[in-house]
């Protein structure tokens, strides 16, 4: 299984310029200047992709998705559906990190690990956290440390809720112990050992996180607070934390205007721009979707409108806003969903277009619309709007000739009336005149010699038509 992508503009995420990129099986094996790798000499099975006018980025990493579904806070009817590989990859996501949220009972770690394994077997890359909102943490084994050490897919703990009415209202000691155990599991297994922390609306904001960093030996690298753009106060506190070296995770939105105007969230592109202007390290910011999580929607008057569902589609949408609205360079914007989460979560072989890395790639056009998505070396999505398949061409041609057929049938009937009233000769003579006229029209339209169904009907003198009904000898 080989792919050769030629003459494509590479953002790795740093801008490399025009390159030829060769993948074999699930790895990137060669990146050379455009025109350096010839298609000659490769096996006939090698797929050659013309990258002229297109961009190549790493596959996207969505580091916070409720892959088992979320919600249930308004009752069982509000439980949201599970994520699917197709539903993730069509938005460019080739790597996903699953988590449990408010509900750690109806959904548990056995189901989460099984779902994660399933996504891996289907052809993308998937990891997960152990636990949910609650402390004590509900683990798969009997401890956080053992979960991280012994379960390959588990890379940390989360999403642990603080500063939220739905949290377990953990004490400082309880929260610090969770972070410490998670770090130990990471140290012993060579994983990130990171705690994904859900931040709520409470004005306490990051208080527990800041105390752990200030009062213990645990570094900021072990904690990733998410939903930091929930409100202005939380955003400002999170920016202070990021200026100290902490990593922060923005939650993207599909309906960006709604969440900014009605819910007073900080727009992701504006938040990233403000952090960059303040001097925050661009490598310490990520964007995730909170995918499949339930999103209650309210009007400006506070009226409940319904329950939405988080979608990974927001990742690329937020990147576009960063590039086109706030003029953040593409290499910085795209790093928030590629190299940054890969580095922070220590996902080996992920997040970069680099020799030896996994062949997880996104091909985009100049407007940053997805053209093709490659996961583990396999094409998992093609934008039919940009790449028309052979079947689509045949279908389109069939529809065209069907329409043409109907057009000439109608034209024949109209001509029948015209000829009947202008000529008083016999019926067969009129039919011959119609056929001659129709052939002239067809030739003028450059369809001379093309057999169209309508003309077979014209040759059938037994056909029921207006001319035969009204003609009288």
Segments from the language model and where they lie:
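Metal-associated gating/positioning segment near the N- to mid-region
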Residues: 46, 51-114
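Active-site gating loops and adjacent loop-to-helix segments of metal-dependent hydrolytic enzymes
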Residues: 75-78, 82-98, 147-168, 178-181, ...
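Active-site core of metal-dependent hydrolases
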Residues: 181-296, 304-305
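Divalent metal-dependent hydrolysis catalytic cores, especially in the metallo-beta-lactamase
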Residues: 83-136, 152-165, 187-202, 221-226
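His/Asp/Glu-enriched, well-ordered alpha-helical/loop segment
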Residues: 277-357, 361-363, 398
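C-terminal cap of metal-dependent C-N hydrolases
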Residues: 8-10, 19, 28, 353-400
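Histidine-rich, glycine-flanked metal-binding segment
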Residues: 2, 10-57, 449, 454
